[in-house]
């Protein structure tokens, strides 16, 4: 039993040592290149393709102009997907990280125009607050006639139901007459 007690005690001290080593190694590796999103943006600007640049062309440009590791392809794929979802890039063809990409600069200018329009929208907002009060006044009288209509509607429904019942026996009578004619022949 002494052996089993010693065995669990040994792994416990070894795990904190490993955690301490990992924490020390993280600050030692500074990036020797800009963000992948920035590198992709510079690649798209310099390639200047009308229909957009492919991931492979972007990868070639990044490897030629920046010092990146062997896993740059994976990082570029992820950065392209993030750029499309954030709106920084526009996906021209394909899906995911395949296809052609362009910088989405056109979407930035409407945002500025929308910000300018936001201040005039405040004035109509005050007018809109007055309009709902008028709408509420119109809704209240509308509810009262609606209640009267509900009283009238059940009477109409009762009248409609017997009419429907009368219509169905007539159809059956017609069918019986047709059957009778067939039997006589």
From Swiss-Prot:
Superkingdom is: Eukaryota
Any one GO CC term of the record: nucleus
Signal sequence extent: none
Q: Where is this region: Disordered?
A: 1-37, 90-185
Show the Pfam families listed in the entry: Linker_histone (PF00538)
Classification via SMART domains: H15
Main site of residence? nucleus
Q: Which GO terms describe its biological process?
A: chromosome condensation; negative regulation of DNA recombination; nucleosome assembly
Role summary: Histones H1 are necessary for the condensation of nucleosome chains into higher-order structures.
State the similarity comment. Answer: Belongs to the histone H1/H5 family.
Name it. Answer: Histone H1-delta
Q: Which organism is it from?
A: Strongylocentrotus purpuratus
């Amino acid at each position: 039993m002494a052996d089993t007690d010693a065995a669990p005690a040994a792994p416990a001290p070894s795990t904190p040592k490993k955690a301490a080593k990992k924490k020390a190694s993280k600050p030692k590796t500074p990036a020797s290149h800009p963000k992948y999103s920035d590198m992709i943006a510079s690649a798209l600007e310099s390639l200047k393709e009308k229909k957009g640049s492919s991931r492979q062309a972007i990868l070639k440009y990044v490897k030629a102009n920046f010092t990146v590791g062997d896993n740059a392809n994976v990082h570029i794929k992820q950065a392209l997907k993030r750029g499309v979802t954030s709106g920084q890039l526009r996906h021209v063809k394909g899906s995911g990280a395949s296809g052609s990409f362009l910088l989405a600069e056109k979407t930035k200018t409407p945002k500025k125009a929308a910000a300018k329009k936001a201040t005039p929208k405040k004035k109509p907002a005050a007018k809109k607050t007055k309009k709902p009060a008028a709408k509420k006044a119109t809704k209240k009288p509308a509810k009262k006639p609606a209640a009267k209509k509900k009283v009238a509607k059940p009477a109409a429904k009762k009248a409609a139901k017997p009419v429907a019942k009368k219509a169905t026996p007539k159809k059956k009578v017609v069918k019986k007459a047709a059957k009778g004619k067939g039997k006589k022949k």
